[in-house]
Amino acid sequence: MQTLKCVVVGDGAVGKTCLLISYTTNQFPADYVPTVFDNYAVTVMIGDEPYTLGLFDTAGQEDYDRLRPLSYPSTDVFLVCFSVVSPPSFENVKEKWFPEVHHHCPGVPCLIVGTQIDLRENKMVIEKLQRQRLRPITPEQGEKFARELRAVKYVECSALTQRGLKNVFDEAIVAALEPPVIKKSKKCTIL
């Protein structure tokens, strides 16, 4: 049985662990426990073939910046996560996570994953964001961002309601099995 390695990265508290636990157990975890490093495995059928999907959870906190890349070797696909109700975590996809992943694993496919979409319509969350002159990230913003960063795709989900959750991992599997061909830009040479 072939194994696919999927590593999940993103800021602390954006829902990476909940995403993985909800997907692998069909239950939303009750408590928040910051992750240092964890991994999970699920068997998925793709056509008639069984695959083991190895899911690697990582710590988003800066304290683990030197430790986290130790989980990167042999990765088949990255899920770069942010919370749709945390614009700073969205910015960090571009400022921190994409550069880190591409530095350590150039050419490995990446999906951008918007998490916590159930909170996008939450009145208390919206009011809190408005007090900071912020608003939730829209699907259109996520899709545009994915194009700009040349990610494979933008997907979003809620680990709480499981809306879009299976699709995130289905798309990750497709990206791992059929990585997109990276078009090299033509370099200008002056003689």
UniProtKB/Swiss-Prot annotation:
Motif (Effector region): 32-40
Spans traversing the lipid bilayer: none
Lineage: Eukaryota, Fungi, Dikarya, Ascomycota, Saccharomycotina
Main location: membrane
Binding site for GTP: 10-17, 57-61, 115-118
Signal peptide: none
Source species: Eremothecium gossypii (strain ATCC 10895 / CBS 109.51 / FGSC 9923 / NRRL Y-1056) (Yeast)
Function text: Involved in development of cell polarity during the cell division cycle. Required for the establishment of actin polarization in germ cells.
Residues cleaved off as propeptide: 189-191
Subcellular localization: Cell membrane
Protein name: Cell division control protein 42
